[in-house]
Amino acid sequence: MFFGSKMLLCLFQALHQLYYDPNIENKNLAQKWLMQAQVSPQAWHFSWLLLNMDKVPEIQYFGASALHIKISRYWNDIPADQYESLKSQLFTQITRFASGSKIVLTRLCVALASLALSMMPEAWPCAVADMVRMFQAEDSNVDGRARCLALLELLTVLPEEFQTSRLPQYRKGQVRSVLAQECGSVFPLLEQLLQQQDSPGFIKQKVLKCFSSWVQLEIPLMDCENLIQAAFTSLQDPELFDTAVEAVVNAISQPDAQRYVNTLLKLIPPVLGLQEQLRQAVQSGDMETSHGICRIAVALGENHSRALLDQVEHWQSFLALVNMIMFCTGIPGHYPVNETTSSLTLTFWYTLQDDILSFEPDKQAVYQQVYRPVYFQLVDVLLHKAQFPSDEEYGFWSSDEKEQFRIYRVDISDTLMYVYEMLGAELLSSLYDKLGRLLTNTEQPSTWQHTEALLYGFQSIAETIDVNYSDVVPGLIGLIPRISISNVQLADTVMFTIGALSEWLADHPVMINNVLPLVLQALGNPELSISSVSTLKKICRECKYDLPPYAANIVAVSQEVLMKQIHKTSQCMWLMQALGFLLSALQVEEILKNLHSLITPYIQQLEKLADETPNPSNKLAIIHILGLLSNLFTTLDISHHDDDHESTEVKKLPVQQGPNPVVVVLQQVFQLIQKVLSKWLNDAQVVESVCAIFEKSVKTLLDDFAPMVPQLCEMLGQMYSTIPQASAIDLTRQALKRKPDLFLCSNLDVKAVFQCGVLSLKFPEAPTVKASCGFFTELLPRCGEIAPVGQVVHENGKVLLQAVLEGIGGQASRSLMDHFAEILFALNKHCFSYLSIWIKEAMQQDGFPSARVSPEQKETFSQQILRERVNKRRVKEMVKEFTLLCRGLHGTEYTADY
């Protein structure tokens, strides 16, 4: 770029395009050109010209930004003898803009701040004190108030610029220390401005923002004491409230603050003094004020609970703070419509509990005596806050508000689960007693919301805590059928509570019939889709050996809802998984009979779809049916090899003899699946759905899968010959992992499969390449034990190595290097004698795998790989290092974190 009138004209045109041209392409071009201009050597010259007062603010802003970029990023380009001149010019410009455009003033202040950070402490030892002195000096041309605002802006951006600066780490520590000492020049000025009666609101607001900025430099809390007290006073001024809250919270929340316990203790009374203001705000519906005061109370309690708990003689004042936070937790109204404050407090209760439970036993017992009643009160408050509003009110909520409320309830659930650690079984007893009184009190009928909240509390705890030994669960199971369910939200919670107790039901099967009818009835309600289906799945998984008496009814109800298509796809898949668990515990004849009635309608539908011309509509239907079969076979496992249950007579039965029902079904539908596949071989989603059926079957069937091997091999060959798909390669890998003797199958062309795998390594899609790498890491360990594999690797291994090295050399994404490294590791471990020859021959090719690496670097890499046959992590590091060399990226900042 050249500098002169022509360049200035180009700058003005580009800026005009950037701000005013409606064409987005022109804007982008202008922005690109301007960014280059900002970093050019000429920027030192044109920046000052653009700051002329006759220019519009947009142009002036660009000039100020260019100065900041040059100072912050290209500091080393500035000769030391020009530092003072640059400093003086910036002071002059800031003084000129003190009464001008605020955005330009801020940018100039940021530029001077960057200059100060680069110069201090050697070249500018008292930078902050000098800034204060310069702006306090009388200047007849500039209004005193404007000068004050300019100084406050400069002092505010200085710590902010430090936080984002690119200073080296050793310099950062040095400069932080200097700035912390310089607060002695800043804080007295801020205190004076806050205390002056005639200081206008906007000046005080700027002072509080400046203080907020400085406390983040880890200034000792005792040095901030006067300003924190002044900020508390400012909370009474509505104009200053938000800024004062931010200042107090930032000061209290500094990690170093806990060292200054005496100062923290002094802060409790002013925080407690805000309670009346908080109550008035709640009564008048002033959400902003209640939110701000709550933030202050939580900041003090959450950040310093351990330090304050340790001050035993002040236990009453800390307990008062805890009760103030409890008030914030239970603030009236429904979150997030009437209040947004209560959610801020939840992490405080975690922190307080952790700190109490971390004390040694004797001390902990004392604190438990004080705080257990507080936590029981907290449970009541949280369950009240978790209650749904009236149906009428809830109907007016937006979908976003409903989603926020759902997340809020999840947070409450997590808190209740955590509180159980402190309150133990007594908490469950308390919830059970309240629910019992609620359901049996005929004189005062309760709202469904109250019942739902108590059940929600039970569910929250039972989902994660082992309640199998609780003496209240039998009573709860007995109470559930007495609940009058007239509402979707209540019904959902009843379902989820039953699901959470499924493990308990497995140990107490006599109680299953108390709740199973409720679950089956709920299955027919689309509004209860997720809760009813997930609960049935849990019951079928945990209690399957006790469900044969109910199996016919469960299958019939499930089949009916599946045929009615009232559930979404994912719930249909869960339902099939539930039926798979259920059928696994039946006799083979019963399984086959149920399978026939269950899947025949889908097979008939699939036959019809297989005859149709492929289109988007029938594609979705095909994928849905294949998904149903796949999910059924995922959990239908008659081998019981994964079951830990051995207590009942049913579970002691030997593994059933005869054909595996899944194999019987697969053999019956195989031709149909092949027919579907023949029309959809080029569609990755359909191929993936087909592969999923067999992949999940292989996992559960193990040796029983043997009868399917010839047909599966033929189908895989058909897929490979058309187009290698990631899902097909994954299926092959899974099959090889479970049954490596698949390679002994006479129908299998191992060489063709191997070559398809090599071809797939060169595909642009990462999932395909990952799957191919996984295939080879399963295949190569078999080359010593399975002759056909060994022969193919011996004859074609060099081609595989060539493809791997090409990928490492730059043909594949760097994110895939770990996967390529695993192939190299497997080759070295299982084919060492071949690899040492192949890698030498491959590396002798000129420019291979990259023209950027020298023969010496290639030789070093080869020797490193051949030496490492134990540590896979080291091989991955070698490959990452070598690929950077191949790509010309080694040692660049671009790859610093690679």
Regions found by a protein language model. Give the residues of each.
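Karyopherin-beta/Importin-beta family HEAT-repeat alpha-solenoid scaffold
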Residues: 2-898
